[in-house]
Design a protein with these regions (language model features):
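ATP-dependent helicase/translocase motor core
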Residues: 1-135, 139-151
């Protein structure tokens, strides 16, 4: 899966229909997971509305659009659910996300920030959230600053 401008080497398989499903590896199972996991009408609209990153053209002449991978999609949904539950229960516990190098943590946080600021407006306690990203490397800090500034 990718966008119109995605280079071939960056296309990837959608290997789960729902969070918690086993990861598919056979070609037929991957095709089925892609069809059911991406192209069911409700899911497709959700992906199209909330999980495509468009870089602001003010910062670059290059047009950039990135669609989430399935782990980013399910992680964002799970984190949002955890944060909403925490706010409603006043537990003080939000969302924590740990990911391996190269798994798309920065984009996951961008997708989550979008969800919290645009899709949780009906939850008064969330309001206009302040989002803090804690990273352990300068490289991640610079990458995050660049991504959030350009989006």
């Amino acid at each position: 899966m990718g966008t119109v401008r995605t280079p071939y080497e960056h296309f990837y398989a959608w290997r789960r229909v729902n969070d918690g499903d086993e990861i598919t590896t056979s070609p037929f199972a991957e095709t089925e997971a892609m069809i059911k996991g991406v192209y069911s009408p409700k899911r497709f609209l959700e992906l199209f509305r909330d999980y495509i990153y468009f870089q602001d053209s003010i910062y670059d002449a290059e047009e950039v659009e990135i669609v989430c991978r399935y782990p980013q999609f399910f992680a964002t949904r799970r984190l949002k659910k955890s944060i909403v539950k925490s706010v409603e229960e006043k537990s003080g516990k939000g969302g924590t996300y740990f990911g391996a190098t190269g798994c798309g943590k920065t984009f996951t946080m961008a997708f989550l920030a979008r969800q919290l600021s645009l899709r949780c407006t009906d939850i008064e306690a969330i309001g206009s959230p302040t989002i803090i990203l804690i990273v352990d490397r300068d490289e991640l800090q610079k990458q995050g600053a660049k991504l959030f500034t350009k989006s």
